[in-house]
Amino acid sequence: PFQTSENIIADLRFLQELQPDMIGIGPFIPHIDTPFRDKAQGDLHKTLRLVAILRLMFPFSLIPSTTALGSIAENGRELGLQVGANVVMPNLSPTDVRKLYNLYNNKAFVGKEAVEGLEELKAQVDSLGYKIVVSRGDAKRNDK
């Protein structure tokens, strides 16, 4: 919740040095059982801008459209894909224990976020002009 623009710039510079195969980014979402419970959640549009910037900086990296995006906006995961994310990760946790993995309040557990909604997720991704590929998921680099 205390991240500044200067922090983000420093993070982007660090990522340039690191050249990671996968970059996860998502908005802050407060959790009721933490000292940050009263802090405002992260901004959807700022997160989407950063996903787009990361895509331009790292054309071959895997960048997930996170569950957090889908939790703060109904179409958050779709928006993430539209601005440059190229990975979705359905929730594979067994249904009887999902609520125990409670990273933040109002985490999306059902529908397209869950493995039970895989066909719906495939249709959604298809409608955006993309295809779901079930593979090991290695980053495709020019130098490899």
Segments the model singles out, each with a brief description of its role:
Residues P1-D11, T67-E74:
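Active-site glycine- and acidic-residue-rich loops that bind
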